[in-house]
Amino acid sequence: MKCPFCGHPDSKVVDSRPDKGGAVIRRRRECEECARRFTTYERVEEMLPLVCKKDGRREHFDRMKVVSGIKKACEKRPVSVEDIERMADRLETRLQECGEREVPASRIGEWIMNELHAVDQVAYVRFASVYRSFKDINEFMVELQDLLKK
């Protein structure tokens, strides 16, 4: 590993331990040239599929975009930050396990709505109202009636 202080290409590991529940390996390294120490973190590279937007564009999956959308839907609702993070974790796991290279944004939106439906129905309706872009109050009422039937 290249030294951040002198740029020498070789260093040795002097300490290594798991961090963040074993998802990351923290390593203390010492430069073989200047003897200064620095820390590196090693983690598995996540292979998440590309997200296919309605207009045909493809984007890398953005967890923060998902978390932000869920937070907006859950604003002033009794949903903890931990609950939101767990929903995002489950979504990422589902994306990794689906084994596809590309996933339509519509499918991701449906998965998020299913998560919200199980946690807070008001947040679910808020998210659905933005995600589904209801054209009028009648479409919105149909969604509410479907929710009440479940």
Curated annotation (Swiss-Prot):
**InterPro entries linked to this entry:** ATP-cone_dom (IPR005144), NrdR-like_N (IPR055173), RNR_NrdR-like (IPR003796)
Chain intervals annotated as zinc finger (unnamed): 3-34
Signal sequence interval, chain numbering: none
Free-text remark on how the cofactor is bound = Binds 1 zinc ion.
- Provide the ATP-cone domain boundaries: 49-139
* PROSITE patterns, sorted: ATP_CONE
List the keywords (alphabetical): ATP-binding, DNA-binding, Metal-binding, Nucleotide-binding, Repressor, Transcription, Transcription regulation, Zinc, Zinc-finger
Q: Which residues form a coiled coil?
A: none
Q: Which GO terms describe its biological process?
A: negative regulation of DNA-templated transcription
According to its UniProt record, which cofactors does this protein need? Zn(2+)
HAMAP family listed in its UniProt record: NrdR
Q: What the protein does?
A: Negatively regulates transcription of bacterial ribonucleotide reductase nrd genes and operons by binding to NrdR-boxes.
Official protein name in the record? Transcriptional repressor NrdR
Q: Which organism is it from?
A: Trichlorobacter lovleyi (strain ATCC BAA-1151 / DSM 17278 / SZ) (Geobacter lovleyi)
Originating gene? nrdR
